[in-house]
Amino acid sequence: MKLKFKHQKFQEDAAKAVCDVFGGQPYKTFDYQVETRKKDGQTSFEKFTGFRNHPIVPQLTDEIVLKHIRDIQRAQQIKPSEALEGKYNLTIEMETGVGKTYTYIKTIFELNKRYGWCKFIIVVPSVAIREGVHKSLEIMKEHFASDYSTPLSYFIYDSKQLGELNAFVTDSKIHVMIINSQKFNCLLYTSDAADEL
């Protein structure tokens, strides 16, 4: 049985709102020289290109981002934020059962379309939700392929699957890494593990 997904305005509005926060950011891809480590611990630079999201341009100041957020909040009759919650720590809230997963996948495609961003990490609270997100991406892949010409690759983080990590770094198409929060925090806050990521 094949599932059919309807385009719903509130989901499109949510994706647009997230993109509008970064209004003024130009469409750019950002390539860089990839660093690899040899087994003996020595660092070497390979002669291949990696891709990452282009940094937020300096003209898009915190004040401008906060203004964009407040404009979006006022349009939705939400009390405007007094300050940013951190460097672009956006909280997007939706009711249960209204298609949050669909909406954030759509948002990924829209951020790519508007700004050229192509690297996304979905951090989930549990292994069960991680598996559910992976399945949702699999189910919705064809649906989004009909709306967007950019292919999307996705995988569950596994430090033993270096091919997936290599593709995440070196490929210019949209890549989504799914990781549970415990592993993400371990990689983020452990110096030895941070080198692994």
Question: Where are the language model's segments positioned?
Answer:
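Walker A/P-loop
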Residues: 87-104
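Helicase-associated low-complexity/disordered flanking segments
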Residues: 1-73
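Conserved structural-core and active-site-/substrate-pathway-adjacent residues in large, well-folded domains
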Residues: 11, 104, 133, 178-180
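Conserved Walker A/P-loop ATP-binding site and its immediately adjacent core
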Residues: 118-140
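Walker A/P-loop NTP-binding motif
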Residues: 102-115
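Conserved small/polar residues in nucleotide/adenosyl-binding loops
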Residues: 189-197
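Pre-Walker A adenine-sensing motif
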Residues: 70-83
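Inter-Walker segment of RecA-like/P-loop motor cores
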Residues: 147-188
